[in-house]
């Protein structure tokens, strides 16, 4: 089963959806179901106008988008509580607004050169850098550090990030989301045909995956 997940590093529901999706796979395998899921991440930018060089707090961007600090605080507290139920720590008071295009380039590089397992690890690490550690994921040093933690050579990662390699390819993949009808993330594209939008609960992911496995 092949699944492509359109997702953004700064999307809280993408982190939650990733965790629930992976939990569903683990549960199915624990039940003795021989399900093999080849999944990887595709780029989507929720905030393409964010600066790549200047940092502001993400909570300020939420306040501007949702009509004030109080409403933003309510939204961020809600998603923090939901994340905690899936054993994810959000520290939204320190999260920094950042342009994610370069992070998406690095994720594409990881997939092409190191495979989906490394890309999945890198995706997790980048999201933790943003949501938990309050790091600027548009910063080259942060991106290199995350890459190294997932087994990518430091010099190779830095040279890649300082180049324009995969810029055109990632731009194309972002545009490809429109072709699939993706308007929000996360969106899970199964075998290039079926679309599952949103951070479904674990039980729903289990049912979907089990049904697809039975029909394969």
Walk through the language-model features, giving the residues of each.
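Structural alpha/beta surface segment adjacent to cysteine/selenocysteine redox centers
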Residues: 19-130
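C-terminal cap of thioredoxin/glutaredoxin-like
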Residues: 3-6, 10, 16-33, 37, ...
């Amino acid at each position: 089963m092949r699944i492509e997940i359109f997702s953004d590093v700064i999307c809280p529901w993408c982190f939650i959806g990733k965790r629930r999706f992976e939990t569903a796979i683990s549960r199915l395998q624990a039940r003795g179901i021989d399900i093999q899921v080849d999944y990887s991440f595709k780029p989507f930018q929720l905030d393409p106008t964010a600066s790549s060089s200047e940092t502001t707090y993400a909570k300020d961007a939420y306040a501007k988008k949702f009509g004030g600090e109080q409403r933003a605080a309510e939204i961020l507290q809600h998603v923090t509580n939901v994340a905690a139920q899936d054993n994810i720590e959000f520290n939204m008071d320190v999260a920094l607004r950042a342009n994610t295009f370069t992070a998406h380039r690095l994720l594409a590089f990881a997939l092409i050169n190191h495979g989906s397992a490394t890309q999945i690890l890198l995706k997790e690490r980048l999201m933790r850098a943003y949501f938990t550690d309050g790091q600027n994921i548009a910063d080259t040093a942060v991106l290199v550090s995350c890459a190294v933690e997932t087994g990518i050579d430091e010099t190779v990662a830095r040279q890649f990030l300082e180049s324009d390699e995969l810029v055109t390819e990632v731009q194309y993949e972002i545009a490809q989301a429109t072709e699939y009808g993706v308007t929000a993330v996360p969106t899970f594209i199964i075998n290039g045909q079926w679309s599952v939008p949103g951070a479904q609960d674990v039980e729903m992911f289990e049912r979907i995956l089990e049904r697809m496995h039975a029909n394969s």
